[in-house]
């Protein structure tokens, strides 16, 4: 399997890491910098990403997008309140957020894709080989739409996203390689825009998340804003000038506030000097750490509620936590450390660089997926309850929050009118009683139901949350045994067709030969299935009879025969037929694996024997 | 064992209610190591789908069996041959009439106290009531443990099985009523660790 990189797609900065031998390593750019500012500038001369884009913030605020992660998977209504802090304009819309840059509108996944593409290129330059597969991290408290948006961004960047992994749990993997071997761990992750708390049990290489909670709109950005508001009031009082209406001045203030906040983590006092020649003034101000702390204390306090909730959900007392790990740049702030220490009653750890640890953990997870690590396994949970809207606008929970994923739930549906062939479902995520108070994820249409009298069809719908925390829906009418097709209309996301179209457009822009690219993709997929089939046969030949082995052998030979040809449809057809031929073998192998698990001796027992 | 196995079969356990939590966790980890999708990234599409499905089954089974209350609920569902928890009406027969009346009284008192603005004295009363009901629930759960042991002792053809199932159902119903009131009291006290979801599920 080709190399899989780990990417931390952050609100403020993004990083890419890979496994170098036994330990993960972050990849620097040509100048040796590992942090890529998550900023994208749309200039008349082209698109800039990272450090160069950041320099455009003050000069071209309306065309320079930062903190786009706050908009991922969100609707206009969700973010309206904070728009006054952003210099760029959003198109009011009921659906996905669209950001206006010049004469075009871009969606958050498209902007994130540009950041991912820059990281992909950085990794390719460093490793000297193409990089097409990645594990990308998201806040643990991200809902389905936000995860899906991140996955879409990966696809738009030309990356196959093999796994969406939660940031705090990724961090725990990085720590796990070094020192965390056993015990209960709380990972407190306060980044630029999001906050997560995850409680894990670590034992024998298994990282089992017991509970998670958080706030996807709380982080360093909010501290900066508190500081900016304070500066604005101060400038108004002392100079009689309202800088709040000047986008360029606002950017200057925001960047100065961010820098001052960072300095105050190490110094007791700091001085700001910002010239505003266009307003005929120079703003000079000394600020003490205590003043900053007074401003942000209420925000830091907001992180403690989710911590207590996660502890309660994990059925643990704070005193039962063995270790507390700090992740995210905002955990450098002394006040944050103090509050965490007070809550858990112990000194938190931060041996690994809090900016890098998530990307390092993503690289570890990537290595697990590639088969490079077999003794570590992360068992994560779904952060929010998932349900459907039922009569009277009430949410009926199908999968409660903090359920270990993958997981599934089955629900029966029927029709309410004679001859009805389509059934609607509204899928929600959240903890509130009423449907309208929860997050609308998508509307699903079950189509192709045979016309029958009302109430006759018995449609079994399976809601499956995969290891990415992303929902898949399958439906089957039990009387006819027919699968119903499921049409998804995401509430705040791109449809598959839209993503497909954007991918094709990006090919066109890159002036690539779409046909040859698609042919290569088909061959790669064929190779994957060929290798997997050969391995499956090697492991499970004894589980199937001669006829079946012959059928698989035949399908394998056919695919090998067309693999080097130029007929993409023939390759795809033969790949699909080989897949079908191996379905039963796969099932048999999986069941054998479960049986083996039951027959295996307890690890401790085995260890005792080898020791004696 | 196949995807159709019940949760006890998944872990190779007899249909008994006393389960050693450490052994259950050991088997859960062991099975996760064998079927988790992480280890089938390079597998055939059939293996990937199969691992996803079995991993979901193992996770559901562990979640259900690790906790006594959900274990008993599941056992009743199995014994009654129901496909899903949907028919959970079966698990909610009448709670004992006196408990029902008592809970209504507590609820009314709470409403009254809230209407009067919940002063310090009233808060203290609510707090005491909350603590009393938590204790009461613990007693019910102890009772459930006793019944569970009894269940494990009776043989297959034993006429006591039906009666035991009924008694367990009554304890579950009582517990569900207690939970509703405990949550209401907790909410009135402004406890942060309120579980909006779980109290609705009972």
Protein language model annotation of sequence segments:
Chain B
Residues 1-202:
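C-terminal accessory/regulatory regions appended to core domains
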């Amino acid at each position: 399997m080709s190399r899989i990189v780990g990417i931390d797609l952050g609100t403020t900065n993004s990083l890419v890491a890979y496994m170098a031998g036994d330990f993960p390593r972050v990849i620097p750019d040509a100048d040796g910098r590992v942090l890529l500012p998550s900023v994208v500038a749309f200039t008349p001369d082209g698109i800039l990403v990272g450090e160069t884009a950041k320099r455009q913030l003050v000069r071209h605020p309306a065309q320079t997008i930062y903190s786009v992660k706050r908009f991922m998977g969100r609707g206009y209504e969700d973010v309206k309140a904070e728009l006054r802090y952003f210099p760029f304009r959003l198109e009011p819309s009921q659906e996905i957020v669209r950001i206006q840059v010049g004469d075009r509108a871009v969606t958050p996944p498209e902007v994130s894709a540009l950041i991912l593409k820059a990281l992909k290129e950085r990794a390719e330059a460093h490793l000297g080989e193409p990089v097409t597969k990645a594990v990308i991290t998201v806040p643990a408290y991200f809902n389905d739409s936000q995860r899906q948006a991140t996955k879409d961004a990966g696809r738009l960047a030309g990356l196959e996203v093999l796994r969406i992994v939660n940031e705090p749990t990724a961090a725990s993997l990085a720590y796990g390689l070094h020192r965390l071997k056993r015990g209960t761990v709380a990972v407190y992750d306060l980044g630029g825009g999001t906050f997560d708390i995850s409680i894990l049990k670590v034992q024998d290489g298994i990282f089992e998340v017991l509970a998670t909670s958080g706030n996807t709109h709380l982080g360093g950005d909010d501290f900066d804003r508190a500081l900016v508001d304070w500066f604005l009031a101060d400038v108004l009082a002392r100079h009689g000038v309202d800088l709040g209406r000047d986008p360029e001045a606002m950017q200057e203030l925001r960047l100065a506030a961010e820098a001052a906040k960072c300095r105050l983590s190490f110094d007791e006092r700091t001085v700001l000097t910002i010239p505003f020649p266009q307003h005929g003034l120079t703003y000079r101000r000394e600020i003490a750490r205590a003043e900053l702390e007074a401003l942000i204390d209420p925000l830091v306090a907001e992180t403690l509620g989710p911590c207590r909730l996660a502890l309660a959900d994990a059925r643990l007392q704070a005193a039962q936590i063995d270790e507390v790990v700090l992740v995210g740049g905002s955990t450098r702030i002394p006040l944050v450390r103090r509050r965490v220490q007070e809550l858990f009653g112990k000194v938190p750890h931060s041996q690994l660089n809090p900016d890098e640890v998530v990307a390092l953990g993503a690289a570890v997870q990537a290595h697990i997926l590639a088969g490079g690590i077999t003794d570590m396994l992360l068992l994560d949970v779904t952060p929010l309850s998932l349900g459907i809207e039922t009569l009277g606008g009430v949410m009926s929970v199908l999968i409660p929050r903090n359920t270990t994923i993958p997981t599934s739930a089955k629900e029966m549906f029927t029709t309410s009118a004679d001859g009805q062939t389509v059934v609607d479902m509204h899928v929600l995520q959240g903890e509130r009683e009423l449907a309208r108070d929860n997050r609308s994820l998508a509307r699903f249409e079950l189509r192709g139901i045979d016309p029958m009298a009302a109430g006759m069809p018995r449609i079994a719908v399976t809601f499956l949350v995969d290891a990415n925390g992303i929902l898949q829906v399958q439906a089957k009418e039990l009387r006819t045994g027919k699968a119903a097709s499921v049409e998804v209309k995401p509430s705040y996301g791109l449809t598959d067709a839209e993503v497909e179209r954007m991918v094709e457009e990006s090919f066109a822009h890159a002036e690539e030969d779409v046909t040859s690219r698609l042919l290569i993709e088909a061959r790669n997929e064929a190779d994957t299935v060929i290798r997997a089939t050969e391995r499956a046969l090697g492991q499970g030949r004894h589980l199937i009879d001669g006829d079946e082995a012959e059928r698989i052998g035949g399908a394998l030979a056919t695919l090998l025969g067309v693999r080097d040809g130029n007929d993409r449809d023939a390759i795809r057809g033969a790949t699909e037929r080989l897949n079908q031929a191996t379905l039963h073998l796969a099932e048999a192998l999986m069941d054998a694996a479960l049986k083996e698990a039951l027959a295996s001796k307890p690890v401790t027992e085995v260890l005792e024997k080898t020791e004696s | 064992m196949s995807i159709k196995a019940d949760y006890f079969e998944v872990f190779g356990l007899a249909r008994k209610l006393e389960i050693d939590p450490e052994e259950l966790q050991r088997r859960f980890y062991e099975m996760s190591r064998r079927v988790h999708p992480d280890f089938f990234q390079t597998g055939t599409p059939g293996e990937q789908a199969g691992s996803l499905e079995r991993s979901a089954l193992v996770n559901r089974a562990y979640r259900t069996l690790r906790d006594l209350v959900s274990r008993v609920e599941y056992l009743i569902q199995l014994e009654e041959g129901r496909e899903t928890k949907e028919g959970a009406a079966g698990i909610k027969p009448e709670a004992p009439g006196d408990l029902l009346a008592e809970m209504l009284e507590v609820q009314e008192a709470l409403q009254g106290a809230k209407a009067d603005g919940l002063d310090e004295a009233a808060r203290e009363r609510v707090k005491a009531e909350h603590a009393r009901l938590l204790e009461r629930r613990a007693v019910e759960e102890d009772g459930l443990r006793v019944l569970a042991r009894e269940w494990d002792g009776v043989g297959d053809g034993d006429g006591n099985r039906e009666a035991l199932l009924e008694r367990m159902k009554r304890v579950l119903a009582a517990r569900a009523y207690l939970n509703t009131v405990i949550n209401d009291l907790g909410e009135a006290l402004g406890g942060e660790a309120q579980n909006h979801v779980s109290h609705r599920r009972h």
